[in-house]
């Protein structure tokens, strides 16, 4: 639950909570570094708290470089079992555009900045489709420099584009079970 997590983290009501994530971590170092740099600029303008989840597969050296930047308001970790709670509690998500993260963004509806991994066609395609359903902005390589990124973050924190909840059915498992039950029943009848 997002409100409970905000209480656990002792976030003040005026503090903006930002969650940055790199999926598995193999290709997220540049973005995570830029997010931390941008948040250093942003905290001069407003009170923020940053949680960075690098993913379990980020190179050890890269992870060490990031964790060297831990502060009271910036915490860098590999992962959390409560990622959905963190997104639900967040005022903003900054991430790559991997499948799991995008599905989590759809469920939590948190305003998001996504930087699709350009070496995979699916991430830009997915992000382009999902941005029509959420308060989301797609970033390019120029956008992830610290100054423009901090400006994009500030903009979305203060003026998220409100969109109607998407008409997405998140009950895939139960729908599949119902379909299989129906299919098996039909197969038995037709035997």
Residue ranges and their predicted role:
Residues 3-92:
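Donor-nucleotide binding loops and adjacent catalytic segments primarily
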Residues 29, 61, 84, 103, ...:
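Alpha-helical elements of the RecA-like P-loop NTPase motor core of helicases
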Residues 150-191:
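C-terminal amphipathic helix plus adjacent low-complexity
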Residues 78-82, 100, 143-148, 168-171:
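Short beta->alpha linker loops
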Residues 21-22, 53, 95-96, 114-117, ...:
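Thr-Gly-centered strand-to-loop micro-motif
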Residues 81-125:
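A donor-sugar binding/catalytic signature common to diverse glycosyltransferases
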């Amino acid at each position: 639950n997002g409100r409970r997590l905000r209480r656990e983290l002792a976030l003040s009501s005026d503090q903006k909570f930002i969650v940055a994530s790199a999926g598995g971590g193999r290709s997220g170092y540049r973005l995570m570094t830029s997010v931390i740099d941008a948040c250093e600029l942003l905290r001069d303008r407003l009170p923020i708290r940053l949680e960075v989840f690098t993913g379990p597969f980020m190179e050890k050296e890269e992870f060490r470089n990031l964790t060297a930047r831990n502060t009271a308001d910036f915490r860098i970790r590999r992962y959390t079992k409560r990622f959905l709670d963190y997104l639900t509690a967040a005022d903003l998500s900054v991430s790559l555009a991997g499948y799991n993260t995008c599905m989590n963004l759809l469920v939590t509806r948190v305003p998001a900045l996504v930087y699709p991994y350009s070496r995979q066609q699916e991430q830009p395609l997915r992000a382009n489709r999902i941005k029509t359903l959420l308060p989301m902005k797609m970033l390019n390589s120029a956008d992830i420099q610290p100054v423009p990124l901090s400006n994009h973050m500030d903009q979305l924190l203060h003026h998220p584009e409100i969109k109607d909840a998407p008409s997405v059915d998140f009950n895939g498992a139960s729908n599949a079970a119902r379909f299989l039950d129906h299919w098996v029943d039909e197969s038995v009848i037709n035997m």
